[in-house]
Amino acid sequence: VFTPHTPINQENLFRGRITEVQQILSTLNTPGQHVLLFGDRGVGKSSLANIASSKLIKIAGKDLVIKRCSKSDSFSTIFESALMKCGIDISIQSKNISGSFSIKGIGCQESTEYNGFMDKVQSPSWIYEKLKDLNTLLLIDEFDSIQNKEDKHKVAELIKLLSDSNSSFKIFVVGIAESAEELTAGHPSVQRCLKEIKLSKMSQRELVDIINSGSAKLKLNFTRDAKFRICRLSSGYPHFTHLISLKSAEGAIINEVTDIDIDDVNEAI
């Protein structure tokens, strides 16, 4: 119910961000348009992306591929799962063909046959040709983890290629950043086809909605002062609202009480 440590992926647990969800759906349903969602850590980017993506695949009948990036990822590995849908496995770099025989001192013979994917998969235009006809949404989360600026630039270049051809393959990029340029490596012409959405902190009303929704499911009651205390401590970050509410609820359940007041919140902290 209160999930501070994992992004929300169930619609019935998601609260707030109605405007942003509608904005994302409208953009991804627009021909040639893709989405870049960015903002501070803890504002709920991944949860919003999960819910918006889930809604889109229901509305548009698209397949969903999710890639959560790590520091070891590169341009090619970002699209590995999407390419698998085309029957292309870039993890197979080569195969060895070996035989064993002996004729007058001539022994084992071995040759290597290269598939050639590893060079091609570095090219945005090659990736584009393989993916352009897929009716798929690729959600690229934690894109800020990508270390190489050239890899980020290639992703932006691929998005432009997809946009120019009005491809049904859509890309939804999510990452921690102060500006969109940090995630696109300053690609000069991607702005017209990549809707940039900066996710700001949540309003107090949205944070209270998180508390009310969770407490109703747990059959607990947070007092008015307790809610305002949690909101003040959260400073607009839903991560902290979930965390403090979770710890307060755990304390109430342990103590076998249903009402949570400001003292219980302070004790949970």
Q: Where are the regions that the model predicts?
A:
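Short regulatory helix/loop adjacent to the ATP-binding pocket of P-loop NTPases
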Residues: 179-194
